[in-house]
Amino acid sequence: MKQTILDLMRMSRICRMVLATCLGSFILVIFYFQSMFQPVMRRNPFAAEGCCRKGSRNALQELYNPTQAEFSAAAVLHQARRDQVAETCRAHSASSRKRRVLTPSDLKHLVVDEDHELIYCYVPKVACTNWKRVMMVLSGRGKYSNPMEIPSNEAHVPSNLKTLNQYSIPDINHRLKNYLKFLFVREPFERLVSAYRNKFTLRYNTSFHKRYGTKIVRRYRKNATTEALQSGADVKFQEFAEYLVDPGTQREAPLNEHWQTVYSLCHPCHIHYDLVGKYETLEDDANYVLKLVGEGDSLRFPSFAKSTRTTDQMAAMFFGNISSQQQSQLYQLYKLDYLMFNYSIPSYLKLQ
């Protein structure tokens, strides 16, 4: 009899735990179904709520209802970018919303700065190292006041920045609703070629050579040498392209973040981003964000080495080495990024 009562008590506790988990997930489901179909906001939606601390509230007000003349042109530009994202999501709802609901694990790319109530979705190969440096300075999660004093490897240490997936579901919902959210994007094929050059043509990236290079050589290179199979250090762009468009690649695991699509990393059809910056106008857009949060006088976004960056001409050279079929397949893979962020189809593509 006692054993039966104990068993019933255990079952009751388990049921309560399951119910609590389901309720939390249901709350997250509600938030995302509400946010997925909300109209594009043209005015600051938070001005009357008194929800935000000084930095973020002023940032949102200036973004949606600029009072300073220098912000007026930027406000029009960023409204057009928001509209482009929303229009693409509506027009391609079947493909852009394959995932109807997000979970906390989908939010690991969203970096949170509590002091300024900012959320930044980082996209590798779009100045994300410098943005992580800036976010470390803004959030005070480090000993530095100058972003360029932060070693690049330290900027990528997970514990140096807090990401949205570390919060409870109610706290996630609160921040997604009330914080200024932004991301930076880049011409998709320039970003792809930049990732290839960085991860497969530099000797020091042995971890990528071992994890991905050996797999690519084994699958797509005929008569590969023993050395190539063991090191994976000499992957050709054609082999990399073949790996990306192979249906089996995405079935086995999500793409690596360095060549994953922006819409899969940041979920712009599920999360309303207030500001979309572009790599092509990086310094202007980045410093605009810093001005919005009241840090424009004390902090400037680091400039980058233009001599080593991947250009359109460089991307054209790499794409000239792959077939028109592979070019078409790659375009289909990154098509939503092209459409959402208003990038033209590259003139060098030979689409079938």
Curated annotation (Swiss-Prot):
Its EC number is 2.8.2.5. It comes from Danio rerio (Zebrafish). It is found in: Golgi apparatus membrane. This is Carbohydrate sulfotransferase 11. Residues 38-352 are lumenal. Keywords: Carbohydrate metabolism, Glycoprotein, Golgi apparatus, Membrane, Signal-anchor, Transferase, Transmembrane, Transmembrane helix. It catalyses: chondroitin beta-D-glucuronate + n 3'-phosphoadenylyl sulfate = chondroitin 4'-sulfate + n adenosine 3',5'-bisphosphate + n H(+). Glycans are attached at N205, N223, N321, N342. Pfam families: Sulfotransfer_2 (PF03567). 3'-phosphoadenylyl sulfate binds at residues 124-130, 186-194.
